[in-house]
Amino acid sequence: MDKLRMTGGTPLNGEVTIAGAKNAALPILCACLLTDQPVVLRNLPDLQDVRTMLKLLQEIGVVVSFPDANNPNHVILNAAVIKSSEATYEMVKTMRASILVLGPLLARMHSAKVSLPGGCAIGARPVDQHIKGLKAMGASIKIKSGYIQAETKPTTERLKGASILTDMITVTGTENLLMAATLASGTTILENAAREPEVGDLAELLVKMGAKITGIGSDRLVIEGVEKLHGAEHSVIPDRIEAGTFLCAVAAAGGEVLVKHCRPDTLDAVIVKLKEAGLKMEIGPDWIKASMQGRPKAVSFRTSEYPAFPTDMQAQLMAVNAVANGNSTITETIFENRFMHVQELNRLGADIAIEGNTAIAQGVERLSGAIVMATDLRASASLVIAGLAAQGETQVDRIYHLDRGYDRMEQKLTRLGANIERIK
C-alpha cells in the first residue's frame, strides 16, 4: 500500500496547475446516460474516483474512448446502448457518488437498480432525499437486499414533473433530481437546491445537451422536461478544493506559489479566511498568486453549504491553524464524524481538542514529523500540509484516500520544492 514520505520545513515556491473538479466530473460523467449520442468531455481529472465511475458506466454499457492515449483528461462517452440498469454493490461500495446513475437511468430507461452507497467514512449522508424527490416525480421505489429498486409505473411512462422541496440542502440529491427532471414530462421545480459551482457546471452541460433549466446557481431550479437530449462537448470546471488545498499548503509551509487554471470566484469564503490568516494574495480571473512569510494567524470558522466555508476545506485549514499564532475554534455543521484527522495531527504535535462538533486548536510554534494515517480524502490532504510544515520526517499511510481526489499531489508539490516522495 502506497505511502507518502516527506521532510518538512522547506517553503514552497513555483507554479501549480489545478485539475478539473472531481465533484463536477462525477455527475457530469453520469449525465452521458441521458442521451444516445456521444458526449465529449475535456479537463477530466485523472483520479481514482473518476476511473471507478468510468468502469461503472462501462458495466452499464457506455462505450468510453480516449482520443489521445496519452491524455486521460479528454474522453468521449457513448451511451447509445444501455446493457444494464444496475449498479452493483461491488462498484458502488468504493464510491458514494455511484448513486448519481440512479436519476439518469430511471429517466431514460424507466427503471434502475442501484446498491446503497459506500465511500468515505465521514457520516451517514443518507439518500432519502433522492428517493423522496424521485417518488414525487412518479417513481415506484423499494429498498430491498441493500439495493434501491426504482421504476416508473407503467414502465413505458416517463417521470412526471413535480415541485420538490428537500428537507436539507443535498448536493448529490440536487444533481440526481436535476438529471432525472430533464427527461420528465412537464415542469419540475427544485426548491432548497444546492448552489455549489459543481451543480452549476452539471447544469451548464445539461443545457448544452438540450435541457431547459433556469435558475442555475440559485437555490431554485426550474426544469422544463424534454423528450430527448443530444450529445455535447464540455470542459469540466477547475477544482476549487484542490486550489484551496494548495493555498493552505503555502499558508502553513510558507513561500510563494502561483496557482494557475483555477476559479477564484468559487473560492470566496476560503480566500477571506486565508487573508485573515495572513496569506498575501494577488487574484486574477483564473489564477491566484499566494505568499506567506512567518507563521499564520489563527482563524476561527464554521462549515456550511456554498457559498459559505466548504466542509471539504475544513481539515486543510485546521492544519494551518495547528501551526498558527493563537487559538481557534472550528465548527463542522455538514457531516458528523469529520474530525478523524485531529488525533493524527496531534501525533505530529498539534494541540487540538474536540467538543461535540467543534474543534479547539491552540497553535504551536512547530510540529514534529511522525508516522500518521489518512482516514479519508480531505484528512489525508491535511496531514500532507502538516507534514510540509513539520520539522523532520513525516510518513502518511493509506494515501489511497488522497488519490481518490487529488491527481498526483506529491508530483505537484515536488515541483514546488517540497521534499516528498511516494513509497511502497
Swiss-Prot record:
Q: Where in the cell is it found?
A: Cytoplasm
Residues that bind UDP-N-acetyl-alpha-D-glucosamine? 96, 125-129, 312, 334
Example of a GO MF term? UDP-N-acetylglucosamine 1-carboxyvinyltransferase activity
| Keyword Cytoplasm belongs to the record | yes
User: Which positions are catalytic residues?
Assistant: 120 (proton donor)
Spell out the reaction equation it catalyses.
Answer: phosphoenolpyruvate + UDP-N-acetyl-alpha-D-glucosamine = UDP-N-acetyl-3-O-(1-carboxyvinyl)-alpha-D-glucosamine + phosphate
Record's keyword terms, sorted? Cell cycle, Cell division, Cell shape, Cell wall biogenesis/degradation, Cytoplasm, Peptidoglycan synthesis, Pyruvate, Transferase
Q: Which residues carry this modification: 2-(S-cysteinyl)pyruvic acid O-phosphothioketal?
A: 120
User: Which EC numbers does the record give?
Assistant: 2.5.1.7
Listed HAMAP family:
MurA
What the record says about family reads: Belongs to the EPSP synthase family. MurA subfamily.
**Name by which UniProt lists this protein:** UDP-N-acetylglucosamine 1-carboxyvinyltransferase
Annotated source species: Polynucleobacter asymbioticus (strain DSM 18221 / CIP 109841 / QLW-P1DMWA-1)
Q: Identify the taxonomic lineage of the organism of origin.
A: Bacteria, Pseudomonadati, Pseudomonadota, Betaproteobacteria, Burkholderiales
Gene field: murA
